[in-house]
């Protein structure tokens, strides 16, 4: 493992890794924001629920 750090500068490698992870996190968040289900800024679109009222038939007609 120590030979790897002789090939690469540790400071540059860590800065590069942090930059890559930050860009990846931004990309994932923007992809989620572009979907309707996971867009937490605008909220989920609430569609009106369709209900049907059924009146029970009365078999005991007088």
Curated annotation (Swiss-Prot):
TM ranges: 13-33
MF annotations from Gene Ontology: bacteriochlorophyll binding; electron transporter, transferring electrons within the cyclic electron transport pathway of photosynthesis activity; metal ion binding
Cellular component aspect of the GO annotation: organelle inner membrane; plasma membrane; plasma membrane light-harvesting complex
Key word Cell membrane present: yes
Propeptide: 53-62
Residues the record lists as binding a bacteriochlorophyll: 29
Residues making up the signal peptide according to the UniProt record: none
Subcellular location(s) of the protein: Cell inner membrane
Family, as annotated: Belongs to the antenna complex alpha subunit family.
Subunit annotation: The core complex is formed by different alpha and beta chains, binding bacteriochlorophyll molecules, and arranged most probably in tetrameric structures disposed around the reaction center. The non-pigmented gamma chains may constitute additional components.
Protein name (Swiss-Prot/TrEMBL): Light-harvesting protein B-870 alpha chain
Organism of origin: Rhodospirillum rubrum
């Amino acid at each position: 493992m120590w030979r790897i750090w002789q090939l690469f500068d540790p400071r540059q490698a860590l800065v590069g890794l942090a930059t890559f992870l930050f860009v990846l996190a931004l990309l994932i968040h923007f992809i989620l924001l572009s979907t309707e289900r996971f867009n937490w800024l605008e909220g989920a679109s609430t569609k009106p629920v369709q209900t049907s009222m059924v009146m029970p038939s009365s078999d005991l007609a007088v």
